[in-house]
Amino acid sequence: MARIAGVDLPRDKRIEAALPYIYGIGWSLSREILKKTGIDPDTRVRDLTEEQVAKLREVIDHEYKVEGDLQREVQMNIKRLIEIGCYRGLRHRRGLPVRGQRTKTNARTRKGPRRTVAGKKKAK
């Protein structure tokens, strides 16, 4: 089993489909990395040689921010927005959508489950 950037890649998948298991690498970046290393995208992970795995590991570690480093950078960016008190920082702090989406309805992913508010009493 190939272990790259602290992630065990699934043995039975093609290397092109296995690389996106690493946080920060999607399909297009996966193809770009394989082109740089000269590895055929249709190769299965189990069929990679140690030399190919080492080449992949070197390219990913030296040229791209992935996994923990990338997650840390994203968190630091959010923390900076909150500290400077900008609008985006306030939205992050309040747990609301940051990019201008509506909040009268929807936005449940950001806001979490509904909190029921007591209704008005019916007048007699």
UniProtKB/Swiss-Prot annotation:
Residues 96-124 are annotated as: Disordered. Pfam families: Ribosomal_S13. InterPro entries: Rbsml_uS13_C, Ribosomal_uS13, Ribosomal_uS13-like_H2TH, Ribosomal_uS13_bac-type, Ribosomal_uS13_CS. It comes from the Bacteria. GO terms for biological process: translation. Keywords: Ribonucleoprotein, Ribosomal protein, RNA-binding, rRNA-binding, tRNA-binding. GO terms for cellular component: cytosol; small ribosomal subunit. One of its GO terms (molecular function) is tRNA binding. Located at the top of the head of the 30S subunit, it contacts several helices of the 16S rRNA. In the 70S ribosome it contacts the 23S rRNA (bridge B1a) and protein L5 of the 50S subunit (bridge B1b), connecting the 2 subunits; these bridges are implicated in subunit movement. Contacts the tRNAs in the A and P-sites. Part of the 30S ribosomal subunit. Forms a loose heterodimer with protein S19. Forms two bridges to the 50S subunit in the 70S ribosome. Belongs to the universal ribosomal protein uS13 family. This is Small ribosomal subunit protein uS13. It comes from Symbiobacterium thermophilum (strain DSM 24528 / JCM 14929 / IAM 14863 / T). The lineage of its organism: Bacteria, Bacillati, Bacillota, Clostridia, Eubacteriales.
